[in-house]
Each structure stands twice: as structure tokens, then as C-alpha cells.
């Protein structure tokens, strides 16, 4: 149920997912071992029934189906699963998911944690991950029955609760914390006074500029187009301490769906933007050094921009 980034990282140690994502954001088997679909709308997934939860309960199709339904009711996953019409567990150890519209990439959306059937209200539901909660829930220890137990990088993770960024940075600087997550694009951007070793990993978090299409200027699509070439995305990446990648497309450059040629054609280019504004007759009509537009062909109007940061 957690929405906290740090807690989600802990969950990934305890709970495994139905599918996993490669570095290219393609789906690969997790607790679903294989899947198929003839039309992109009805999908059949095979559950790895050789796996078991930390309490010994063997994973079933009911558990997998319940986990999907639980995710559908969660604000964290509801959007990505919005097209799911029906989830059915079958006696042969498979799960059938029916969508309201075809999506050939649907398995990539199922990297959601798996819990036991009807365990959604439990404070600490059992998982199938490499680590399990200790009896006092203050640490995570290696799950002895996990297939990769002998490959665990550390024997235990000790958990501590901190309620603010200041508390986290102070604990890290004082040596109370060994690991901390920092996201420069959010309120959890951490700055440490001591030397630290940083590791980065790719996400699908997207920072973008949206236009108010109800405004008198931006309601016109051709007026919005030049602004694509005005945004210096590389500069924005630098502001995020290089913890991001620039893309003119709503797709990560590492993804197999990324179109390099199209991305290059939409890259930052002030000269192209100026020409587009000129062609649209968005020019400096009154000599004040600023461009205006003339929707009625008679009176030039100033272009006023108000930027609002929306972090949801």
C-alpha cells in the first residue's frame, strides 16, 4: 500500500513481481513464466507454481490474479492498469487478463508486487522475494528457501524510520545509514555533506512541459509546435545533476520503442523555432523586442506565459 519511494525500494527486496523489465524496458519473466495473446486484448499468463511465499504457501494463479486486482485498486498502479476489464484465475495455473483495448506491450505493465490471496489488509503480507521480514520487522534477512539465497549480496538489511529529508541526510552523514535514495526531480533530492558513492538507474519517470489548451494562445496547435524547439533539454538534465536523460519523445532512449531519427528532428533548435514563429506571423509588431500574435489580423496581442510546477 505504500506510496513512499524509499519504502517501495524495501518492498522490492521482499516482494517479487509478475514480470520484470530489462534495461531496454522490455518485459521478461518474473513470477509469470510466459504469456501469449492473439489480439493484444486477451492475455494468458502462466504462473510459476514452483515458487513459494515466505510462509511456505505455494504460489497459485489465485494469488497472481488477486495481486493484479489489488494493484488496480491502488493509486500507484491504477492508471497503468486502467484498461483491464477482467482478471480470471484458471485451474490450470494460468491467469487470463482481458483488456478494453489492445496493448501489445501490456506484459511490461505487470512489474507489480505479488502477495498472497486476500492478504491486502495485512500490515506485512508475505512475499516471495530474496529477503523476508524478521520477527520484529526491524530488519530483512535472507529467505533461506529462495532459489537465489546463496547469491544474496548481504545477509541483512536493518530498517530505520525517518520522517524528513533533513533526518535522512543527517543520519547518512553521521554513519547511521548506509543506503539512501535520492531523486533530484522530486522532494527527496538529498544533498550530503560527507563523501558518498552514487549509483544511477533508469526509470520511466517523465519530466515534461504541458500546455493549457484553454488559453487564447496555446489553444491553437500550430502555435504550440515551435516551443518544442525552444526547450533546452540538455540544460534541464544538467540542472538535475545529470541524473536524467534528454528526450524529445515520451520514451526513454534505452527503450526499443525509441526513434532516434524522430528524436533528433525534434531537438532543441532556436533557429528553427524562430523561422516557425515568423511563418506563423508571430513577430515583433510594435518594436518592443517581443513577439506578438494577431489572431484577428488587425490588433497584435502580447504573449504571456505563466509556469506552474506540478509534482504529482
What residue ranges belong to the model's regions?
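Short, well-ordered beta-strand elements
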Residues: 1, 42-45, 67, 95-97, ...
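Surface-exposed ligand-recognition segments of extracellular binding domains, strongest
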Residues: 25-52, 82-121
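N-terminal lobe/hinge region of extracytoplasmic solute-binding protein
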Residues: 1-39, 69
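Aromatic- and charge-enriched surface segment that lines or borders ligand/interaction sites
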Residues: 6, 33-76, 217
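Append "and occasionally in soluble cytosolic enzymes with long acidic Gly/Pro-rich linkers
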Residues: 220-312
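A structural "hinge/loop" feature
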Residues: 1-11, 31-32, 57, 105-114, ...
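Gly/Pro-rich hinge or "lid" segments in bacterial periplasmic/extracellular proteins
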Residues: 5, 98-161, 166-167, 270-271, ...
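Extracellular/periplasmic solute-recognition and catalytic clefts
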Residues: 88, 134-139, 158-215, 225-226, ...
Amino acid at each position: 500500500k505504500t506510496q513512499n519511494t524509499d519504502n517501495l525500494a524495501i518492498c522490492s527486496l521482499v516482494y517479487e513481481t509478475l514480470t520484470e523489465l530489462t534495461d531496454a524496458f522490455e518485459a521478461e519473466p518474473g513470477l509469470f513464466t510466459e504469456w501469449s495473446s492473439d489480439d493484444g486484448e486477451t492475455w494468458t499468463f502462466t504462473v510459476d507454481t514452483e515458487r513459494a511465499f515466505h510462509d511456505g504457501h505455494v504460489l497459485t494463479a489465485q494469488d497472481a490474479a488477486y495481486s493484479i486486482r489489488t494493484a488496480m485498486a491502488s493509486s500507484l498502479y491504477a492508471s497503468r492498469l486502467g484498461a483491464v476489464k477482467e482478471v480470471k484465475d484458471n485451474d490450470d495455473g494460468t491467469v487470463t487478463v482481458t483488456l478494453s483495448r489492445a496493448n501489445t506491450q501490456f506484459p511490461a505493465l505487470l512489474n507489480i508486487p505479488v502477495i498472497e490471496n486476500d492478504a491486502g489488509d495485512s500490515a506485512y503480507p508475505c512475499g516471495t522475494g530474496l529477503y523476508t521480514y524478521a520477527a520484529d520487522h526491524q530488519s530483512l534477512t535472507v529467505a533461506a528457501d529462495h532459489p537465489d539465497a546463496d547469491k544474496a549480496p548481504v545477509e541483512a538489511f536493518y530498517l530505520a524510520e525517518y520522517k524528513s529529508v533533513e533526518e535522512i541526510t543527517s543520519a547518512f552523514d553521521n554513519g547511521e545509514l548506509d543506503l539512501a535514495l535520492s531523486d533530484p526531480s522530486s522532494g527527496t533530492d538529498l544533498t550530503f555533506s560527507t563523501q558518498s558513492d552514487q549509483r544511477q538507474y533508469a526509470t520511466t519517470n517523465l519530466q515534461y512541459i504541458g500546455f493549457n489548451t484553454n488559453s487564447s494562445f496555446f489553444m491553437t496547435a500550430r502555435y504550440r509546435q515551435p516551443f518544442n524547439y525552444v526547450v533546452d533539454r540538455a540544460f534541464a538534465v544538467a540542472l538535475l545533476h545529470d541524473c536524467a536523460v534528454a528526450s524529445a519523445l515520451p520514451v526513454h532512449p534505452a527503450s526499443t520503442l525509441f526513434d532516434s531519427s524522430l528524436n533528433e528532428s525534434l531537438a532543441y533548435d532556436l533557429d528553427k523555432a524562430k523561422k516557425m514563429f515568423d511563418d506563423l506571423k508571430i513577430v515583433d509588431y510594435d518594436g518592443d523586442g517581443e513577439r506578438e500574435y494577431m489572431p484577428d489580423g488587425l490588433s497584435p496581442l502580447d504573449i504571456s506565459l505563466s509556469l506552474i510546477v506540478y509534482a504529482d
